[in-house]
Each structure stands twice: as structure tokens, then as C-alpha cells.
């Protein structure tokens, strides 16, 4: 009771709802690190919110809605000064930028295989042994036990303590192959190539009348979240789909971000290492056609 968890206004719903559920059970409180108009985490507010009551800081490495890269190394360091653990959601970051978890000194870091060219239904949680050894298992079953009697059960060593039952074997193999594939390309190569695509697309899209980008952080990945005039994001996305262009529309499971900007949603274009400038040219022309059809 009275313990505090810090999360940011940039979070995906999956980084908000579980903590709300937990706080309802144990009486802890959630404190929210606000955004700036550029879609960046307000670092000064973060520093002011930190206190001895802070037990956990949970922020995303990269915003899935805006592409903002958060200054997680500094966040981790400052949180540790107050004795707080830090959990970083790396789902949106892991396929675009390299994260050295040892250098970051992060307590927990998560990601999902499907964001890394891998299969759905499997992900990864990195945790420091000092924390994982203190934590009880969250599931019971086979493999996670050392010895079972009707009087008492003892648990297996890490990581098996947290891996009850038959694992997703096919998913794990696919995840491993996907990581080998990306490592062969090289994350530094991916990051520099995607940054070039981002700059190219941003400059071309800004030439379109009424085009507005949400989230213009100095440091961001290859995500452009936008609207055009008063056109609805869903309508734009539907027409682009007919032209063979895949974009995401709506709130991107980040309703607080949309609320901050006072909008119902955006069109989100995400560029990856397999995209080309020629495809961006086609995207821009198709967007102009969609705008003309809807105007």
C-alpha cells in the first residue's frame, strides 16, 4: 500500500491495464509521466515524480504510436538512485535499434517475436537473477518444479521456474531463426537504413497540403503517425489498402496518446529494412489519390 509505479503517457494499453489491475488488488498507486507537444517523455516531470515510494518504473523503449525513442539509459540510472526497479517494454524497439541490456543495467526488458520477423505467440523477458530469484512462479505445472510432495513443492532453478508446462517449441525455434536472420543483416545496418527511409518519407509527405505529423521527437524510429486535414484515418487507411499499401489506423492501443493530442486516431506508416524509396514514392502518390477521392 502507498507504493508507487511510474509509467508514461506514451504507453501501449498492455503497459497500463495490468498495472491498474495490480494496483486495485494491493493498493499501490500509478503516477504518470506526461508527454510534451513533440511526443517526447517529459524528463523533468519524470525526475519530479521519482521518490522513495517509487518501486517500479515502466516505460517503453520506443513508442509504438509515435516512434519516439525514450532516453532509457538515463531513466534507468535515475530510478536506481531511488532504489526502484525498471522494466522496459522493448517490443517496438527491438527490430529497429540495438539494445545492450548489460550496458543499460536494466532490471527487466521484454520483447515479442512477431516484432522481430518471428512467429506470434512467443516473446522474451530478460530479468536480472537477483530479481528473478526473489520472485515466486506465476504458473504451476511440469518442468518448473524440483521436487513435489503433498507437504511442499520446491521449484526448479532459473529460467525453468517460470516456464511451466510444454513450451511453444515451434515458436522458440522460429524465434531463434528470426534472430539469426536479423543478426546476419546487422542491427546497425538496419538502424541507419531505416533512418534514411524515415527522413526521405518525412520530407516528401510534408509537401502534401494539410498533412500533419504527430510525434516529431528528435530521436525516433521509422514510424510516421499522421492525419490529413479533417479526413478520418480509417477512410484513408481503407483506400490505401485498395492500393496495396498496409498502414495501421486508429488509436494504436495507445488511447492516452490520442487523448493528449485531442484526436480520435491517426494513420501510422511504419518502414522496415525491406522497404525502399520507390515504395515510399508509390505510398505518397497513393496517399494523394486517397485524399483527392475523400475531399
Language model regions located:
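Pyridoxal 5′-phosphate
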Residues: 1-295
